[in-house]
């Protein structure tokens, strides 16, 4: 099977150039030798969960704060300037048991070294039922939550949640609790999975109910994107620029800002 091989250092990596966020200093709250995620997406650049089982532990709050401060200090001394500090990496950041405290530390260090930098969290939304996670996400500049579709069968086929209790309708209701302080991120792609199932979610069957959900959530922005790196399943294809632009314009007609990454 074709396998992606990107596993990020932990707890700090980069800075890297992000298509969506600019010069990004990464914060990885997962082990440096594997992947820990509540989704097992067929398009994940880090590969499948079962093939990336870590032996190391997650970094502690103290380890994250120390590594982040050291890196920010060096960047300041070297004249480097990050646009954004981004929680991403090898899995779901909000699952860290000290996530809220780590966000508090990050805000403090950002304000000390680069007060103009934004703090972003890339999340699959599976822990937003926790009040502490929601409090933390309200403190960051870019609360970026995944919503690839509202179709449960498509989610089961492509995002593959680890929990059988995952309910996209409940996720949408929880997203509404941010009262607009949320950016919705959606992957659009084409092709087939390894079982030959069509994974094209660019048509109206998927886009129309997704737009209805966006109207409910009322996000400050929507980010749509497509495959840019290697994927663990061989038959996945990029959505075209024209298709993404057409979806972007439909979002904008709702009065919601939308960016597309090709």
Over which residues does each language-model region extend?
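Conserved AdoMet/S-adenosylmethionine-binding subsite of the radical SAM
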Residues: 95-237
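Short glycine-rich or small-residue beta-strand-to-loop segments that form or flank ligand, phosphate
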Residues: 85-90
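Auxiliary Fe-S-binding modules of radical SAM enzymes
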Residues: 2-20, 73, 190-262
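Short strand->helix junction
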Residues: 34, 92-93
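Canonical Radical SAM [4Fe-4S] cluster-binding loop centered on the CxxxCxxC motif
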Residues: 21-66
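Short hydrophobic-acidic sequence motifs that mark active-site Asp/Glu residues
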Residues: 24-26, 84, 144, 183
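Short, well-ordered amphipathic alpha-helices
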Residues: 27, 66-74, 102-109, 211
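Conserved alpha-helical substructure of the radical SAM core
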Residues: 48-84, 98-101
């Amino acid at each position: 099977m074709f396998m992606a091989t990107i596993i990020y250092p932990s707890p700090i990596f980069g800075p890297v150039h992000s298509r969506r966020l600019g010069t990004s200093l990464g914060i990885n709250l997962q082990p440096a030798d594997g992947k820990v995620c509540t989704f097992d997406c067929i398009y994940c650049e880090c590969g499948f969960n079962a093939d990336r089982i870590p032996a190391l532990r997650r970094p502690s709050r103290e380890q994250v704060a120390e590594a982040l401060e050291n890196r920010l200090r060096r960047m300041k001394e070297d004249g480097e300037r990050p646009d954004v500090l981004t929680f991403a990496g090898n899995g779901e950041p909000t699952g860290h048991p000290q996530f809220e405290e780590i966000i508090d530390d990050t805000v403090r260090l950002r304000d000390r070294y680069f007060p103009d930098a934004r703090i972003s969290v890339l999340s699959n939304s599976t822990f937003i039922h926790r009040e502490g996670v929601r409090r933390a996400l309200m403190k960051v500049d870019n609360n970026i939550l995944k919503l690839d579709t509202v179709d449960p069968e498509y989610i089961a086929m492509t995002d593959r949640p680890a929990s059988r209790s995952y309910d996209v309708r409940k996720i949408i209701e929880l997203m509404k609790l941010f009262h607009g302080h949320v950016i919705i991120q959606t992957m659009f792609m084409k092709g087939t999975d390894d079982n030959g199932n069509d994974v094209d979610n660019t048509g109206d069957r998927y886009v129309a109910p997704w737009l209805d959900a966006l109207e409910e959530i009322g996000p400050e922005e929507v980010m749509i994107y497509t495959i840019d790196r290697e994927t663990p399943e061989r038959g996945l294809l990029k959505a075209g620029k024209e298709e993404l632009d057409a979806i972007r314009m439909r979002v904008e007609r709702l009065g919601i800002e939308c960016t597309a990454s090709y």
